């Protein structure tokens, strides 16, 4: 059964445009509450990032959940992985995140966690969608849900993050710059690193509801690079608006992406005999990651793009680590979803154990030139991926790469974009192929 509302990462869109409207969120809260109540007494945690529309949608969801008889526990602004963790520790039936991740404040969205802190199973999402098409009813007044606020949510999550670091380990003397993207990590991330001993300079931690991800964070890393160089820091850490993505900058100002961070974490676990299986990447993971892991005899598999698919592959194989080059990194020995702060801590510990700088550690992975071009296709009725001219051109590029590269065309699960990716050994050749394919995709979408 196809989904009407849920994409690869929940429901997302422009605020005020259906379905990102208060009336829909009221109905969604009710439908979710009715679905979760089938498990018995229902308790749902609700958290959000720092965008201004979060207050409006929090109230709407709260009312809908209560109307269905679900008790609601409000977390306030918290990183997405913190909501997953707290859902688990409070033994709730589900957690709801109000966030549009790395998108600007004009967007917002909803995603759900199961009681185990994992992404909601497909069958539950489909049940919620079916309920959304039914008339909304209200339970008897004696069975209405109650609403409370968890005042120590941030402190609980800070202690959880610190517990992932051995008590014998300290980051004394480590000079960090941390970019919080004016987002959900703005309170907890600086506290975690400081309480573990690091000297922390904080950037972009003054959210006003409108500035989340604006020229900062993991999608705009230039100011972090400058701050690392000016402050002579050991490295910089950039989070996205909801705290499930992380990128780093080494002391030279070079960007260290999710593939490189994943390799550093996996190699450290491998060195200590604690890797347990292999590593899960995605179709977008750089070929260099696969080759570097192969040199260490570490198995590598590719999942579909999206951290939910990485997580599903990890669970099926009972492996520990996986991630995306965008900075979603999952460490199943600590978390049930991508957690940017936890991933950053694992990288810092790996560097400390090896006595390496981040710049030295990233040299072990030689990335192949990879060009990614996003092509917007708007309201076009043409499916560019099925167009004969696009399929023929893609096949010809694959043939030209002669087994020494890859071509990938895919639709974004959250935006009206086609992502054109070409990877190979010669950067000039790769860029030429990518630009030609992107131009063709744009032409057939007109």
UniProtKB/Swiss-Prot annotation:
Note on how the cofactor is bound: Binds 1 Mg(2+) ion per subunit.
Stored CDD domains: GlmM
One GO cellular component, as annotated: cytosol
Modified residues (Phosphoserine): 101
A GO BP entry: peptidoglycan biosynthetic process
EC number: 5.4.2.10
Modification after translation (UniProt): Activated by phosphorylation.
Similarity field: Belongs to the phosphohexose mutase family.
NCBIfam families: glmM, PRK10887.1
Name of the protein described by the UniProt record: Phosphoglucosamine mutase
Gene from which this protein is expressed: glmM
């Amino acid at each position: 059964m196809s989904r009407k509302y849920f994409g690869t990462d929940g429901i997302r869109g422009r605020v005020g445009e259906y379905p990102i409207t208060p009336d829909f969120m009221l109905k969604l809260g009710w439908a979710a509450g009715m679905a979760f109540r089938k498990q018995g007494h229902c308790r749902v945690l609700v958290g959000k990032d720092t965008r201004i529309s979060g207050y409006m949608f929090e109230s709407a969801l709260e009312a809908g959940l209560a109307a269905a008889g679900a008790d609601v526990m409000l977390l306030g602004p918290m990183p997405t992985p913190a909501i997953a963790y707290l859902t688990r520790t409070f033994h709730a039936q589900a957690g709801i995140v109000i966030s549009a991740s790395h998108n600007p404040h004009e967007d917002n969205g909803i995603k759900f966690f199961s009681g185990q802190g994992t992404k909601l199973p497909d069958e539950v999402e489909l049940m919620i969608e079916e309920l959304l098409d039914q008339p909304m009813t209200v339970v008897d007044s004696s069975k209405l849900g109650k609403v409370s606020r968890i005042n120590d949510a941030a402190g609980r999550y800070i202690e959880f993050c610190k517990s992932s670091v051995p008590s014998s380990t300290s980051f004394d003397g480590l000079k960090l710059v941390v970019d919080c993207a004016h987002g959900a990590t703005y309170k907890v991330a600086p506290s975690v690193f400081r309480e573990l001993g690091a000297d922390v300079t904080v950037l972009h931690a003054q959210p006003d509801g409108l500035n989340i991800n604006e020229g900062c964070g993991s999608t705009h890393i230039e100011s972090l690079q400058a701050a690392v160089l000016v402050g002579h820091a050991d490295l910089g850490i950039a989070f996205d608006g909801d705290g499930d993505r992380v990128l780093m900058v080494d002391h030279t100002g070079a960007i260290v992406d999710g593939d490189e961070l994943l390799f550093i974490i996996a190699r450290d676990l491998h060195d200590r005999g604690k890797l347990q299986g292999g590593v899960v990447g995605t179709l977008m993971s750089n070929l260099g990651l696969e080759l570097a892991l192969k040199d260490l005899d570490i198995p590598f598999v590719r999942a579909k793009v999206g951290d939910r698919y990485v997580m599903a592959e990890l669970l099926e194989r009972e492996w520990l680590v996986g991630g995306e080059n965008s900075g979603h990194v999952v460490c199943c020995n600590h978390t049930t979803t991508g957690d940017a702060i936890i991933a950053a801590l694992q990288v810092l510990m790996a560097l400390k154990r090896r006595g390496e700088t981040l710049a030295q550690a990233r040299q072990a992975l030689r990335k192949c030139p990879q060009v990614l071009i996003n092509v917007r296709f708007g309201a076009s009725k043409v499916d560019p991926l099925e167009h004969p001219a696009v399929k023929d051109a893609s096949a010809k590029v694959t043939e030209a790469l002669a087994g020494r590269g890859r071509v990938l065309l895919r639709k974004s699960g959250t935006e009206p974009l086609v992502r054109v990716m070409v990877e190979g050994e010669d950067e000039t050749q790769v860029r030429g192929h990518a630009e030609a394919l992107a131009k063709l995709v744009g032409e057939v979408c007109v």
